[in-house]
């Protein structure tokens, strides 16, 4: 396996929460129903950071759909990525076969780091 790309994104939790409160429809556009069920702003901010980090790994090609990247929790609560549709197609063009995700939120910021490998 070889690393194809690394993406990192940082989101200010309070600012993100204010955006969600000001524009309620944005959550529908950005998150899957499962993700929206996590309601706590720091969790949503971390998931948005993950989606941004994935886009950075892919070179942010036009046409990526936010819902095509979903953060899911595996055994023991470990986060991972579910990639479908436009994001899966962009990943296939780059030969990406596996994804690694790390999320954290502390001190008012949420951070996601994504590594993609062939």
Curated annotation (Swiss-Prot):
Principal subcellular localization: cytoplasm
GO cellular component, one term: cytoplasm
Localization (cell): Cytoplasm
Keywords: Cytoplasm, Fatty acid biosynthesis, Fatty acid metabolism, Lipid biosynthesis, Lipid metabolism, Magnesium, Metal-binding, Transferase
GO molecular function: holo-[acyl-carrier-protein] synthase activity; magnesium ion binding
Known EC number: 2.7.8.7
Transmembrane segments: none
GO biological process, one term: fatty acid biosynthetic process
Keyword field contains Cytoplasm: yes
Position of the signal peptide: none
Catalytic activity: apo-[ACP] + CoA = holo-[ACP] + adenosine 3',5'-bisphosphate + H(+)
Binding site for Mg(2+): 9, 52
Co-factor requirement: Mg(2+)
Record family assignment: Belongs to the P-Pant transferase superfamily. AcpS family.
Function: Transfers the 4'-phosphopantetheine moiety from coenzyme A to a Ser of acyl-carrier-protein.
Protein name: Holo-[acyl-carrier-protein] synthase
Organism: Frankia casuarinae (strain DSM 45818 / CECT 9043 / HFP020203 / CcI3)
